[in-house]
UniProtKB/Swiss-Prot annotation:
Record keywords: Acyltransferase, Endoplasmic reticulum, Lipid biosynthesis, Lipid metabolism, Membrane, Phospholipid biosynthesis, Phospholipid metabolism, Phosphoprotein, Transferase, Transmembrane, Transmembrane helix
Tissue: Most abundant in epididymal fat, followed by small intestine, brown adipose tissue, kidney, heart and colon.
Protein name according to UniProt: Glycerol-3-phosphate acyltransferase 3
Job of this protein: Converts glycerol-3-phosphate to 1-acyl-sn-glycerol-3-phosphate (lysophosphatidic acid or LPA) by incorporating an acyl moiety at the sn-1 position of the glycerol backbone. Also converts LPA into 1,2-diacyl-sn-glycerol-3-phosphate (phosphatidic acid or PA) by incorporating an acyl moiety at the sn-2 position of the glycerol backbone. Protects cells against lipotoxicity.
Source organism of the structure: Mus musculus (Mouse)
The keyword Lipid metabolism appears for this protein: yes
Example GO molecular function: 1-acylglycerol-3-phosphate O-acyltransferase activity
Amino acid sequence: MEGADLAVKLLSTWLTLVGGLILLPSAFGLSLGISEIYMKILVKTLEWATLRIQKGAPKESALKNSASVGIIQRDESPMEKGLSGLRGRDFELSDVFYFSKKGLEAIVEDEVTQRFSSEELVSWNLLTRTNVNFQYISPRLTMVWVLGVLVRYCFLLPLRVTLAFIGISLLIIGTTLVGQLPDSSLKNWLSELVHLTCCRICVRSLSGTIHYHNKQYRPQKGGICVANHTSPIDVLILATDGCYAMVGQVHGGLMGIIQRAMVKACPHVWFERSEIKDRHLVTKRLKEHIADKKKLPILIFPEGTCINNTSVMMFKKGSFEIGGTIYPVAIKYNPQFGDAFWNSSKYNLVSYLLRIMTSWAIVCDVWYMPPMTREEGEDAVQFANRVKSAIAVQGGLTELPWDGGLKRAKVKDTFKEEQQKNYSKMIVGNGSPNLARD
C-alpha cells in the first residue's frame, strides 16, 4: 500500500506541475519564460558542440559542407545548348553521350526524390538519428550527448507525451461535445475556443517555438490560406495563431479519429483523393464556403503531400480555380533542433510523433504574406505558380515545377514524350535546311 500511495502522490505532483506551469499558461496563450530559458541553453549547447566538432574533425566538416550543396556539379543548360558541342548539323551517334550524362545525373542525385527524405545537416545536432556523417570527437562531447539522451528520453518525452495526450483528448472530447449543439454563433465561438486551446497545448508538447511575421496579413474570414506542406504539425503551427476550416486527405488511425471528431464542430472538408466524385464535391463545398464572409478562412496545402522543407513543389490548380482571395503563408522549420518532416511512406503518425517528441524542439518561422487575387487573363495554373513563387522566395525555399505526387507514383510517360518531341524538333529543324540546300 505504501508503494501505491507513493506512486499516486508522485503522479498527482507531476500532473499538478504540468497543469500549473505548462497546461494553463499554454491554454491562454501565455508563457512563463521556461521555454525561452530552455532554448537559450539549447542554442549555447549546440553552438559549443559545433565548435568542438569543427575543431576535432576539420577535414570531415569541410567535406560535409561541400556535400551539402550537391554531390555532383549539374549541367543546367537546355538540350539545344548541351548538344551543340557534341554534334554537327544532323543526328549523330555521339548524341547518346549527352542523354547518358543526363541519365547518370538523375540517378546519382535527382532534384525530386531527395525532397522526400529528411534534410541533411551541416553540423551534428547531438541526436543519434542524425549521427551519420559525424564520428567520435572527444570525451566531453560524448558526455554531453549521453546527458542529452537522458534529458530527452527520461524527462522531456514523459512530459511531452502527457501534454500531447491531454491536448488530443481535450480536442476529441471538446469537438464531439460542441458538435452536438445546434448551429449558432455560440457553437462557432466554442468550436474556435476548443481548437485554439488544444492546438496551443499540442504545440507545447513539441517544445514548439514559433516566430510569426507580418501579422497584419493574417488570413481573414471568407478567404483561402495556402501554405507549403512539411508535416501534419503545420496545422498546429498555424492554428495556434488563428482558427481555420481545413481541407485535406482522409486518414486512418489516430489521424482519422481526430479528423472525425473535428468535423463535428467545424465545417472541415475531408476527401479521398482517388475518388473523382469527392473532388467535385470538394470544389462545390469550397465555393459555398468562401461565398460566406462570416466563415473561417480555409486552410489548404496545394502541394498535396509533405515535402522536406527545402523546396516548394507544384501547386495543384484546383485551389486556385474557385475564386476568392488567396492568403499565402510560408513556413520554414529550423532542422538544427529537430526534423519536422513527415516521411509518411516510412513512419506512421504515432512513430512520427515519437520521433519529434524525442527531438530537442520544433522551431519555425511563419510569414504571413499580402493577399493575392487572380489577375485578368491569368489562368489557374499561372496563378498557382505565382503564389508558389512568392512563398518560395519568402521562405528561402527552392522552387520546383515537379508534382509532389511523384512521391508515390511513377513518372508519367508524357514527361518522357516531351523530351523526345524536343529532340525530334531539333533534328527536323537542323535537317530541313540541309535538305533545302541539296
